[in-house]
Each structure stands twice: as C-alpha cells, then as structure tokens.
Regions:
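Short S/T/G/P-rich N-terminal loop/turn motif that feeds into the first structured element of a domain
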Residues: 1-51, 56-68, 86-92
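Outer-membrane beta-barrel domain signature
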Residues: 72-81
Length: 92
C-alpha cells in the first residue's frame, strides 16, 4: 500500500478557504476511485493557514490512475495556486 501525506500552507486566509474547498471536493470525488483505501482532509487545529490531505492507495497503479483523472488535475491546480504543497510518500 502507498500512503501520501500532503501538507498545504496557504499564502492568505482567503486562499486557504479556496484551497480547502478544492481539497474537500477532491476527497469526495476520490472516495469512488478504484484502489482508494482512505482519502481525508484535516485542517490544522493550531495554524489557520494549514491543512493536510492523507491518502492511502492499494497500489501504484491505482494511484497513477487517480492522478491522471481530470478532476485531480483541475483541483490540484487550484490548491497549488493558493499556496505551497509538500508531499511525503510511504510504502507499507
């Protein structure tokens, strides 16, 4: 399995709201993708400009198919436009 932790930091609180909306839409749409084990968005309890997306995928093929979908490309572009993303990936 593959676990992705995506840390997002917004440039402004307005951009945070836009990015969080896009992240929640992405999580909702991704719940139905083949091979998804978990896909959640977690706003920070201590820093108002930060949230984390945690994804778990059955295998690399499932993750690759997810990453190639139009909604993934569109919504990730919105998130990236609003701030900085840092990605951690783990295989287990």
């Amino acid at each position: 399995m593959i676990r992705l932790n995506c840390f997002f930091q917004a440039s402004t609180l307005v951009q945070y709201a836009e990015a969080l909306t896009a992240a929640k839409m992405l999580a909702e749409k991704s719940q139905h993708h083949e091979g998804v084990v978990a896909y959640d968005v977690f706003p920070s309890a201590t820093r108002p400009e930060i949230f984390m997306i945690c994804e778990t995928w059955k295998d690399q093929e499932s993750l690759d198919k997810h990453s190639a979908t139009p909604e993934f490309k569109e919504l990730v572009a919105v998130i990236q436009r609003c701030g900085t993303l840092k990605l951690e990936s783990f295989n287990f």
